[in-house]
């Protein structure tokens, strides 16, 4: 029983310490689901984002827990505003990192449909980032894929 309490306490600490990360992951998941095709490739990109953006070393188990928490959070929300509010508070480099991974997710199926492009424009607007920056990041990812 004590072990169960300690385990639950550890899970709460993981979630409490990573609220902003969970919201960023939820935004990525939302983008992945916008074309109604949430693939393993997109999940892999999101897990890579967790590893890159985490402030401390996380083991695979913690990464999966964060991913599951974010998926649950994304399912229960009907708008992106709460996710972008967290990202908007962050520095420019973090915002660029989020945009980069959003584009990696969107372009993971080699195309960007109207809904995905509209989502990216909305996100850039909510984060007060110019479309030009988003376009440059998108082109960099396309060039990287074509190497």
Residue ranges and their predicted role:
Residues 1-33, 37-147:
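Small-residue-enriched hydrophobic alpha-helices in membranes
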């Amino acid at each position: 029983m004590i072990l169960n309490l300690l385990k639950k306490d550890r899970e709460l600490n993981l979630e409490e310490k990573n609220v902003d990360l969970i919201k960023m992951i939820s935004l990525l998941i939302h983008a992945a689901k916008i074309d109604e095709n949430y693939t393993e490739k997109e999940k892999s990109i999101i897990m890579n984002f967790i590893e890159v953006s985490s402030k401390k070393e996380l083991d695979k188990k913690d990464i999966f827990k964060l991913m599951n928490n974010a998926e649950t959070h994304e399912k229960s929300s009907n708008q992106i505003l709460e996710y972008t509010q967290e990202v908007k508070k962050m520095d420019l480099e973090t915002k660029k990192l989020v945009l980069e991974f959003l584009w990696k997710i969107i372009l993971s199926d080699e195309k960007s449909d109207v809904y995905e492009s509209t989502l990216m424009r909305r996100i850039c607007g909510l984060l007060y980032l110019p479309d030009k920056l988003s376009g440059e990041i998108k082109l960099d990812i396309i060039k990287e894929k074509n190497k």
